[in-house]
Amino acid sequence: SKHPEIKKPTFREVYEQFLKWKFAEGTNYSESTRNNYTAAYTYCAELYDKIFEDLKATELQNFLDKQKGLKKGSLVKILSLFNQMYKYAMFAEIVTERKSQYVRINAVDDEEHGTPFTEHELRILWKNANNPDIQLILIMSYSGWRIGELSGLEVNLKEKYFKGGIKTQAGKGRIVPIHPMIYDFVKTRITADGTLLNMNKVTYRMFRFYPILEKLEISGSPKHTPHDCRHTFSALCEKYSVRENDRKRMLGHSFGSDITNAVYGHRTLEELRSEIEKIKVPFVTNCD
């Protein structure tokens, strides 16, 4: 209340000032650093109009705790944004205390949580497979890639496989054959865009994934997320008796203490292909 007549900046205004300050001319931060902040900010809509100085640590904590649909990685990005904004706000003398230092992430690692698409939901997806957004959902559901891995994948249309992956040692540089039923979808996207996902994953989730599932009335309960496509692939592997070790290999799961498999389990592309092709798509063969 040093100058009561001066309007105190809101969360949105501090964010905008922070971006200008952080990414000022002459700074050499990467595009992906900036994208992380932008992505985190899109989740904070309910804070936009609050006076930044008046925010309490308990409010920020409650806000993070409420974000049930978000993966731990996204929460980490949001908290990192809070920390950076407070760093700027201290510098600009907007606040005298960094409230975000008291906030923590209470979420568990959620890699294993999720709900595969049911047979009924898959049937509906295949029935509408002429839609490009649905094609991407099917690509992920029949290959097991995470949404965050798509844009960096090497796609070999001639030899019909994907190569790439992030996250873990076992997950990096893994090879997954392209299932014949999704090959044309993959080819169309790569030919048109050179990549499977030509937008950031937050945009995709908000403006493509959720709306199309709503339109088809298969949003699911709990609500399906793009990560559920990965769980769908895992479930399909189990349903069609894909070898357990090959399922792990294609999903990039580690073999834990099973050293023999990790070291001697080198599988050729063709061996993996014969496993992934055990997965049938009865919805389509019946229609044709």
Model features per residue range: what roles?
Residues 120-121, 143, 148, 152-186:
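Conserved tyrosine-mediated DNA breakage-rejoining catalytic core shared by Y-recombinases
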Residues 72, 76-78, 91, 95-147, ...:
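Basic, Lys/Arg- and aromatic-enriched nucleic-acid-binding interface segment
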Residues 11, 33, 37, 74, ...:
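Hydrophobic (often cysteine-bearing) scaffold residues that line and stabilize catalytic clefts
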Residues 127, 143, 176, 190-195, ...:
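Short, basic (Lys/Arg/His-rich) helix/loop patches that form interaction surfaces
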Residues 12-70, 85-90:
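Basic/aromatic-enriched alpha-helical hairpins
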Residues 156-160, 242-263, 285-288:
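Short, polar N-cap/turn motifs at the start of nucleic acid-interacting alpha helices
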Residues 1-9, 24-25:
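N-terminal helical hairpins
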Residues 165-170, 183, 251-281:
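Catalytic-site neighborhood detector that most strongly recognizes the C-terminal catalytic loop/helix
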